[in-house]
From Swiss-Prot:
Pfam families according to UniProt: LIAS_N, Radical_SAM
Compartments it resides in: Mitochondrion
The keyword 4Fe-4S appears for this protein: yes
Origin: domain of life: Eukaryota
GO MF terms, alphabetically ordered: 4 iron, 4 sulfur cluster binding; lipoate synthase activity; metal ion binding
Miscellaneous field: This protein may be expected to contain an N-terminal transit peptide but none has been predicted.
Name of the protein in its database record: Lipoyl synthase, mitochondrial
Enzyme class (EC, first level): transferase
Keyword Transport: no
Length: 364
């Protein structure tokens, strides 16, 4: 009997067939196994209730090990048609958003419409490079960023008008290299937006302009609805958290004078928690903001963007955030948004502020 010999061609065919079978087996196992969403949830697919969480929430002095991210800070992956549409147009028009640059955890909710269908976005003007180096912020820094894009005000207004947004937040990098800090550029963007849609509500989250009150006046009188400037942290921690050119008292002065220049404005600020502040210091900061007329306040958890930035000292519980929300209401803030994932441009706050501004317009 003749034995059938294996030719090189026969061997290759068998090897290829085996690889195909293995690939099919892997695909089947993957289809039946956990998906990516499962990896950002607990093993049972349900996020733990914070009251039952027994992980370490605070780093003691001298400890170097990073804290484990608690379950209430884990968010879903951004997706959906509105999200994809906005992201695509931003790329086409070469616009930046703080939502992406600062790695905001609420990007999917805001760009997609969320619970109240108040679709929002936060555009970052004047490029993606800042002249300051705050130790909590992931935005790129340089002493001399690229020059301003003269077409940015028009491009921004075009994009926003095509999105059909209800509420837009304009923020910016600091531009200490410019004589006016970029205030005229921001103001021109607001005017372009309002010229295309007078009904849209515009919030400007702006720098301190080195305390230059003429720059503050330029912004306050440009037609915006909400003037926002973040105090970020308590007074004692300010030199260690913010760039040395940013001062606690200077921030308070900017917020006070913005309101003086335009009493019809809503003024707004934000505090990060988890940097080592005490309750008494948070309380004092909230009182200081109320004393200069700030009407809206957000409080959220600081989250370390990279290993080069400040480490989280404490993960504040949802219960404690609820306490600060109640305290803000007691102090007389028009609105207090306080929660682990709340950011200065928080969507639920924008929905509330939109209602307030709409009522004000009706009464005029």
């Amino acid at each position: 009997m003749l034995r059938k010999l294996n030719t090189p061609t026969t061997t290759l065919v068998r090897a290829a067939s085996t690889r195909v079978e293995k690939l099919e087996e892997i695909r089947e196992r993957l289809s039946k196994g956990p998906n990516f969403q499962d990896f950002i949830q607990n093993s049972d697919g349900v996020k733990e209730d914070w009251e039952n969480y027994d992980g370490k929430l605070r780093r003691e002095k001298g400890e170097t090990q990073q804290l484990r991210l608690p379950p209430w800070l884990k968010t879903t992956i951004p997706m959906g048609k509105n999200y994809a549409k906005i992201k695509s147009q931003l790329r086409d028009l070469k616009l930046s958003t703080v939502c992406e640059e600062a790695r905001c955890p609420n990007i999917g909710e805001c760009w997609g419409g969320g619970e109240h269908s108040t679709q929002t976005a936060t555009i970052m003007l004047m490029g993606d490079t800042c002249t300051r180096g705050c130790r909590f912020c992931s935005v790129k820094t340089a002493r001399a960023p690229p020059p301003l894009d003269v077409n940015e005000p028009v491009n921004t207004a075009k994009a926003i008008s095509s999105w059909g947004l209800d509420y837009i937040v304009l923020t910016s990098v600091d531009r200490d290299d410019l004589p006016d800090g970029g205030s005229k550029h921001i103001a021109e963007t607001v005017r372009e937006i309002k010229a295309r849609n007078s009904n849209i509500f515009v919030e400007c989250l702006v720098p301190d302009f080195r305390g230059d009150l003429e720059c503050v006046k330029t912004i306050a009188s440009c037609g915006l609805d909400v003037y926002a400037h973040n105090i970020e942290t308590v007074e004692k921690l300010t030199p260690f958290v913010r760039d040395r050119r940013a001062h606690y008292r200077q921030t308070l002065q900017v917020l006070r004078e913005a309101k003086n220049f335009n009493p019809n404005l809503i003024t707004k600020s934000s505090i990060m928690l988890g940097l080592g502040e005490t309750d008494a210091e948070v309380e004092q900061t909230m009182q200081d903001l109320r004393e200069v007329g700030v009407e809206c306040l957000t409080l959220g958890q600081y989250m370390q963007p990279t290993k080069r930035h400040l480490k989280v000292i404490e993960y504040v519980t949802p219960e404690k955030f609820k306490h600060w929300e109640q305290r803000g209401n007691e102090l007389g803030f028009l609105y207090t948004a306080s929660g682990p994932l709340v950011r200065s441009s928080y969507k639920a706050g924008e929905f509330f502020i939109t209602s307030i501004l709409a009522n004000r317009r009706k009464s005029v």
